[in-house]
Amino acid sequence: MWEITVVGEVRDYSRFLLFENMLKSNYDNDVIVAISLTKSSAKLSIAVKVKKLIHTIKRLVIELILKICKEEYFVENLQIDTDDKDMQYFIILTAVMSNLEDEIDYAMVKFKFAKMVYIRSLLRFRLSRLYFLWEKFAVYFNYNMSRGIGQEIYLNFLKFLASNSRNGKDIIYLEDIDNHMILKDKSKNVLVSIPKSDEISIVVNLIIFAPNKLIINCYGVLSDKIANLIKYLFDDRVSILI
């Protein structure tokens, strides 16, 4: 049995709860998860009973850690000149997801898993190169996007990302299944499942996968605001709207 305890701050507790729910939904019989909370810390303990799942769970743990630290960094360092809270969250989430898979690959090679991992110490002392990359992104963003021009420049920035992602897919299907929006590749393999209520994450994931053709099989499910945003970002790549 492989075990790990991830130690974070009290504010990480809600993220740990979401992570616990995800693991229980997908690996309930093969993974044991427990969360504890004190006045000064939150702890996420995981035990993997099936050997073939260890690599997968390690990647998920690294992804969780990187998302927490990366979001903190960009919230503090990106200069987003808009009062639109949705747009602020949208920009932050897109920045967090940008190059995330490459960063996970890097962390998996550089980091040797111990029984206990302290989230912010791991980034600061073991994976400090990632902070350098995030700083470069923030400097570029702040120089080019933070000049009081307004919302249009942010939309153009997102459109640029949607056209230039390194993870670009030929075809993405977007489907509505059991109160979740499912992204599938051209072979109909599930790439990601997102709660229908989290529409911003739906768009962010579409930007990250940057399909050459986007086939939407859930007409009327998305809000008008999000549907129009998808049409704007992907333009003529939205080839079928059923």
Name each model feature, range by range.
Residues 1-200, 204-206:
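Conserved mixed alpha/beta catalytic, RNA-binding, or beta-rich assembly cores of soluble enzyme
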Residues 185-242:
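C-terminal structured domains
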